[in-house]
Amino acid sequence: MNALDISSVTFCYDGSPAPALRDFSMAVADGRTHALLGPNGAGKSTLMRIITGQLQGQTGGVSVYGLQMPDSKALSFIGCAPQPISLYPSLTARENLRFFGAMAGMSKDQIALRSEWALAKTGLSEYSEAAGTTFSGGMQRRLNLAAALLHSPKLLLLDEPSAGVDPQSRNHMYDLLMELNAGGVTILLCTHMMEEAQRLCSGLTLLDRGERIYDGRMSDIGNLEEFFLARTGRGLRDL
């Protein structure tokens, strides 16, 4: 079974002369790690918002484990760490997790248990009572990931998860993501870091100007930077 199926999605913002996504399709098999790459403006963030039901395509559809979005059960399978960090800076780390756990319909006991686990896994246990205003950008990213993991999702959507994270914490995050995947969590990673994509992902979808221009195995590519340049005509500065 596929964890994610996107079928012929077209989406155009009001007033835009060209669609952000044009007849876009892709699939991610259950238990896989898949990277989403493309130049700035390729449609990556739009696609992530469509997957989570924040936007609705003018054509096509999205299903998660066979359930058509935005089905509530399908949404419960998804954990999302978006690029714009969705935390409340006036709350402590633990209070943020308590809030997001309640939004996910978790019981108080579940929230308490999973919060301890998520804080430990993201290296934030000692900062659990610290206010978000004291967190660095990298710490906020890690708390963003902790919130996404709180309800034990089957499909994890990550949009630039390691941006601003220090190298040591980034490696710790990579180890955690590989551990989660080994435990059966499917991961879709949207990143501008090619080394990150190659280290973590077995599959790759490449977008440019709203269209899919490659969809296949990472192992078939070789040098990802050269492949990206050849397919898009653009380099790292355009990511």
Where are these regions (language model features)?
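A short, flexible loop at the N-terminus of ABC-type nucleotide-binding domains that lies
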Residues: 1-6, 10-23
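Conserved ABC ATPase "signature" region
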Residues: 98, 102, 109-127
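Catalytic Walker B motif of ABC-type/P-loop ATPase nucleotide-binding domains
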Residues: 156-159
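Conserved ABC ATPase signature
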Residues: 131-135
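Conserved ABC transporter NBD signature motif
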Residues: 60-74, 214-216
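Helix-to-loop junction immediately C-terminal to a conserved catalytic motif
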Residues: 52
